[in-house]
C-alpha cells in the first residue's frame, strides 16, 4: 500500500489486492458472523452511540454526586412517559447549549415550572435561530446561492474568485450582521447576556446552528429555565450538585443531563481493528478528517464514509455523496492519484481553519460552501454543475435537493 500512487493500486473502487473482513456480533445472542467483502461503506454518522463525557479530576466527577447523571443520548432513548417521569418533581441541571440541551430544558420547564427551575450550564453563546427568515428574507438567499458563495474564499479557487471574495468581504460582514440583528431582536439575547462574541458566518461555517424551541427565552424570563455560564469548560461535581469555576456555592440539583455531544471520531476509529487504519482514518488532531470529497481516504482502499462530514442539510448532502459513490462504482470516473487527493484535503483544511470556529473545524463542515462542494461532485460524475435556468436564477436563487433530481 505504501508504494501505491493510485487508490487501491489502480484508482478504481474494486481491487484484487485484498478484501475486508467484517465481523458482526449479535449483542442479544452473542453470536458472531464473519463476512469477506470487496468494499465497505461506513454510514455511521457522528451524533450517536459514543457520548462525549468531559474528563474530571479524581473525586470531582459524577461519583462525588449524590444524584443521578445521564447523557442526553440516554434521555432521548426513553419513551415520552418515561422521560417525563424522570424529570418530574426534580431539580434538573442540563450541561450544554445546543439542540439537545435546549429541547430537554424545555421539557423540564414544562414538567416543573418555576417551582423547580431547570438550570442550563453552558460555555459558549451561539447564534441559534428562532426561524430561517431573518427580517422576512429566507436564509437560503443569503447563504445557499452562487452569489453568497462569491463572498467567501474557497478551496482551490483561482485568482479571480479570490479577488472577488476579498473585494466583497464588506458585504459578507453585512450579511452576518443582518442575520445577527434579527436573532438578537427576536430572542432578546442582549437582555440575557447571550450575544455571541463571534459572527454568524463563523457559526454557519462550523455547522453549529440549532433551532431555538418556541418560547425558550420566555421560559428564561419567567424563571423556569436558568442560564448559567461556566467561564471555561471546567466544572466539577460535589455531593449537592455542580461546582462552576469561580463560584463558591454549588448548583444544587437532583439530576444532571449531559447534553455535551458525541465522540464521532472515536466511533469511526474504533470500527477498525488495525492500529494503522485507526490512526489514518482520523488523521492529525490539528486537521480536518482527511477524506477526499468527504468520502474517501487516500490511504485506506475499498472503503467510503457517508454522513460523517456535516452540512446544514445532512440528508441532502449524504444523498449527493451516495450518488457520487454509485457513479464511482459504475466506472463513470476514476479517482485521482493519492497525492492529488491529499492536496485537495489540505485545501479544504485551510478553508475550515479560516472560517470555522477554532474548536469546531474538525467537524469538516461544508455549511457555507454547499454549491462549491456539489459542483465538484457534479464535475466528477460528468454532470453539468449549473442547474438553474437563466443567468439571474443561476446566480441568485438558492440551490436545494430538487435541483439535483436528474443528472
Which role does the model predict for each range below?
Residues 138-141, 340-348:
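Post-kinase regulatory C-tail/linker adjacent to protein kinase catalytic domains
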Residues 144, 329, 348-351, 403:
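Alpha-helix boundary/capping detector
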Residues 1-136, 161-339, 356-407:
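Flavin (primarily FAD) cofactor-binding/catalytic cores of flavoenzymes
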Residues 345-353, 365:
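Long alpha-helical segments found as membrane-embedded helices
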Residues 127-159:
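A catalytic-pocket lid/entrance helix-loop region that shapes and gates access to the active site
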Amino acid at each position: 500500500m505504501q508504494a501505491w500512487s493510485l487508490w487501491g493500486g489502480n484508482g478504481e473502487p474494486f481491487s484484487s489486492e485484498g478484501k475486508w473482513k467484517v465481523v458482526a456480533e449479535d449483542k442479544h445472542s452473542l453470536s458472531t458472523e464473519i463476512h469477506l467483502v470487496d468494499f465497505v461503506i461506513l454510514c455511521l454518522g457522528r451524533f450517536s452511540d459514543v457520548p462525549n463525557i468531559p474528563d474530571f479530576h479524581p473525586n470531582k466527577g459524577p461519583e462525588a454526586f449524590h444524584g443521578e447523571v445521564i447523557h442526553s443520548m440516554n434521555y432521548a432513548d426513553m419513551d415520552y412517559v418515561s422521560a417525563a417521569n424522570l424529570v418530574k418533581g426534580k431539580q434538573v441541571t442540563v450541561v450544554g447549549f445546543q439542540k439537545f440541551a435546549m429541547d430537554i430544558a424545555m421539557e423540564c420547564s414544562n414538567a416543573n415550572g418555576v417551582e423547580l427551575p431547570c438550570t442550563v450550564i453552558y460555555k459558549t453563546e451561539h447564534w441559534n435561530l428562532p426561524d430561517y427568515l431573518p427580517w422576512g428574507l429566507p436564509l437560503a438567499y443569503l447563504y445557499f446561492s452562487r452569489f453568497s458563495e462569491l463572498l467567501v474564499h474557497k478551496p482551490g479557487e483561482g485568482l479571480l474568485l479570490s479577488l472577488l471574495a476579498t473585494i466583497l468581504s464588506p458585504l459578507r460582514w453585512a450579511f452576518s450582521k443582518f442575520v445577527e440583528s434579527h436573532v438578537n431582536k427576536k430572542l432578546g439575547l442582549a437582555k440575557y447576556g447571550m450575544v455571541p462574541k463571534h459572527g454568524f458566518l463563523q457559526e454557519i461555517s462550523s455547522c453549529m446552528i440549532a433551532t431555538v424551541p418556541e418560547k425558550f427565552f420566555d421560559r428564561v424570563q419567567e424563571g423556569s429555565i436558568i442560564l448559567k455560564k461556566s467561564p471555561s469548560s471546567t466544572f466539577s461535581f460535589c455531593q449537592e450538585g455542580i461546582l462552576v469555576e469561580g463560584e463558591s456555592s454549588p448548583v444544587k440539583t437532583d439530576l444532571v443531563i449531559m447534553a455535551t455531544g458525541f465522540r464521532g471520531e472515536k466511533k469511526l476509529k474504533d470500527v477498525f481493528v488495525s492500529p494503522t487504519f485507526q490512526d489514518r482514518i482520523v488523521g492529525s488532531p490539528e486537521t480536518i478528517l482527511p477524506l477526499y470529497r468527504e468520502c474517501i481516504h487516500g490511504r485506506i482502499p475499498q472503503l467510503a464514509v457517508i454522513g460523517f462530514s456535516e452540512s446544514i442539510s445532512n440528508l441532502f448532502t449524504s444523498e449527493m455523496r451516495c450518488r457520487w459513490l454509485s457513479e464511482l462504482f459504475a466506472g463513470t470516473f476514476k479517482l485521482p492519484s493519492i497525492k492529488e487527493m491529499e492536496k485537495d484535503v489540505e485545501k479544504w483544511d485551510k478553508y475550515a481553519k479560516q472560517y470555522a470556529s477554532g474548536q469546531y473545524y474538525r467537524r469538516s463542515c461544508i455549511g457555507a460552501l454547499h454549491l462549491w462542494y456539489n459542483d465538484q461532485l457534479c464535475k466528477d460524475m460528468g454532470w453539468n454543475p449549473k442547474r438553474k435556468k437563466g443567468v439571474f436564477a443561476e446566480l441568485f436563487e438558492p440551490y436545494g435537493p430538487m435541483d439535483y433530481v436528474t443528472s
